[in-house]
A protein has these predicted regions:
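Juxtadomain coupling helices with adjacent low-complexity linkers
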Residues: 135-179
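GAF sensory/regulatory domain recognition
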Residues: 33-36, 46-72
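Regulatory sensory and allosteric helical modules in signal-transduction proteins
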Residues: 59-61, 66-106, 113-115
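Amphipathic alpha-helical regulatory segments at dimerization interfaces
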Residues: 15-19, 29-41, 49, 83, ...
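A short, aliphatic-rich beta-strand micro-motif
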Residues: 120-129
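Signal-transmission linkers at sensory-effector interfaces
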Residues: 1-26, 174-179
Length: 179
């Protein structure tokens, strides 16, 4: 991620934290725009989740259409996001379509009449404050095939995503959902 984009991201996150709510979705939308442009994906291919107050589930903050669909149990053995929390480490999977995983969230339409393609490639990184995981950020590439989805994610991009997660942490820690 360019220094300019990182600085812009930090500015938006600082503003969200000042406002005292990680659920300022206008601000969060701007963060997602910056992240999606950096990785060359569509905004709906960026997911930001926060851990619920009882430390049992992950709840989507973005994409907005997944907020009310459901939550991911942290005990789930098939959810990459839950594994990211449990193992406290980022991960990249460039063959995600063939990895057993829960696809319930992939079935949610991205627009009223538009179904999303399957996730082919994905990066997942924990969001932590003082070493306590408070959420997960994921960036995916969707398509009918891995080739159609675009280039593989690199380990450098995974490091960038981890840095983005670190930058988002102050805002997510203040989210009413995370308290």
């Amino acid at each position: 991620m360019s220094a300019e984009n990182i600085n812009e991201l930090k500015k938006w996150v600082a503003e969200l934290a000042r406002q005292g709510s990680g659920e300022d979705f206008v601000g969060l939308n701007r963060v997602v725009d910056i992240v999606s442009k950096n990785f060359g994906v569509q905004p709906h291919e960026v997911a930001i989740m926060t851990i619920t107050p009882d430390d049992r589930f992950l709840r989507f903050l973005f994409p907005s259409m997944l907020r009310e669909v459901g939550q991911i149990p942290l005990t789930s053995t098939n959810a990459l996001a839950a594994r990211t929390v449990r193992e406290k480490r980022p991960e990249v999977i460039n063959h995600f379509a063939v990895v057993p995983h829960s696809s319930v969230f992939e079935a949610v339409p991205i627009a009223e009449d538009t179904r999303a393609d399957a996730i082919q490639k994905i990066m997942s990184a924990p969001i932590a404050v003082d070493r306590k995981i408070c959420g997960v950020i994921q960036v995916s590439r969707k398509g009918k095939s891995a080739g159609e989805a675009g280039p593989d994610f690199t380990h450098q991009q995974l490091r960038e995503l981890k840095a983005i997660g670190d930058a988002l942490a102050p805002c997510l820690a203040l989210s009413p959902v995370a308290k």
